[in-house]
């Protein structure tokens, strides 16, 4: 590892030792952060996979019901039944902090038209129970869909932060800290050499003075 280009003085040695202490402490903190991020990320990915499977299974069930509804209803009645939604939905996206990562938090409000509280935007005279089942399941799936979007975005952001933290940890571990250690070692060696040279000169001067005396 190449050393830093600095003057081999005691002042520089003191500065570098402080930098090494700070870098070592930063490395430990970042490594701890990386480990905790990985732990939370793995848990979130497991939950994301479970939630995605539930959503996909529920959507598959809704699709089967819709196919059955199309089979027993005319296209005209089917289109008229679902063209005007009964429900209005608004979504508010906020943030929360997870290990210095800002991840999204989605809150949504649902408002049904009319006072009866029915989710079906049609009467039941010309529709089928399969269509009722389709809309009922989709109504229940919506919160899961929004949660899935929130969780998957959180996974993406945490993965980015893990990669960024990993690069910083590696830079400290394999470049900054070894460079500082090598430079400190070099300065100490040079200072020791200078001290030995100074001692040798003093001994020679002392010897010369004694001989003249």
UniProtKB/Swiss-Prot annotation:
Cite the Gene3D superfamilies for this sequence: 1.10.287.3240
InterPro entries on file? V_ATPase_D
Q: Which cysteines are joined by disulfide bonds?
A: none
The role this protein plays is: Produces ATP from ADP in the presence of a proton gradient across the membrane.
What's the protein name? Answer: V-type ATP synthase subunit D
Keyword field contains Disulfide bond: no
Please list the GO biological process terms of this entry.
proton motive force-driven plasma membrane ATP synthesis
Molecular-function GO terms, alphabetical? ATP binding; proton-transporting ATP synthase activity, rotational mechanism; proton-transporting ATPase activity, rotational mechanism
